[in-house]
């Protein structure tokens, strides 16, 4: 049991570390630009290297974890992240920063796959779903902790990368914990046996497609909602931008509450419920004429979608007997792709059909996901009846 807890702690730290790098970048764009006398837009584009690296990492994890071994990958990735964080602190040029962020994104993407693989290997049934949702809560907690460190560092005229260096220290600690931990419960280090066990069916495929569509809808909202609210209600952009703050504030609380709910509810029912709620709330957001409703609706949306990511992983792997790292990586690749390509897809749509139609598409996407979840659950029920006969 002690080893189980240590492995689970490593999986939580993986999410904590990735969030440490991803959630505070917006606060560092201007200080970073000032440090290297660079254009703000050029610096802001570095964030795409983190996201692109994470997507590449999840794709690489699909092939590497079972071949290299989960323990070796964990040690290598978090050692590399710690070294990259140090390179950001001593970076003599913006190129080194860009290289460091790419390495962090890539290794962090692999790390998220490792985290999911650990949980689905070590825990089963309802506790597995609960642990996966706790990972989302860990991500959101880091989204509060590290920006506070950034705020303290910047207000005290410290180096812009102090907060990233602190995340690097956590990565280094994770590497040492991994070195001292037995990973045999995660399937050992041999990949050949696990590779043959990777199971694929409509349920797990729908988990990946559903997460892609869910992230597409969510990040379309986060990208365009402030401009939509500004234009629709003719208010200042700064005021309209509060909708994003309200979303993330509710997401932190929602992730913690979701942990309790999932421990008492089937993951299929939980996911179907939160997607249905998201569909209804976004329908009201895009059609309401009452500005005073928006804050409450956005809080509800953030609360409902707080555990979306790992809930889809838990949902997908519930359709296979023995989930492997490839199953987890597939769903993570789908989610990363949805988040990464959402701005590009929605931008093209906005230029062709207009902002109003783009916002109307959000609840429609959720409706498609709901339909797909219902179909996959019915297929599973039919298969269980046939097996029983």
Feature locations, PLM:
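Helix-breaking motifs and short loop linkers at transmembrane-helix boundaries and internal kinks
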Residues: 37, 69, 90-95, 288-289
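Conserved MFS/SLC helix-loop-helix module at the cytosolic interface between two early adjacent transmembrane helices
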Residues: 56-92
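Helix-to-loop junctions at the C-terminal end of transmembrane segments
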Residues: 57-69, 254-266, 350
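Helix-loop-helix hairpin linking two adjacent transmembrane segments in secondary transporters
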Residues: 131-183
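C-terminal transmembrane helical hairpin of 12-TM major facilitator-type secondary transporters
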Residues: 268-312
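A late C-terminal transmembrane helix in Major Facilitator Superfamily
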Residues: 319-355, 362
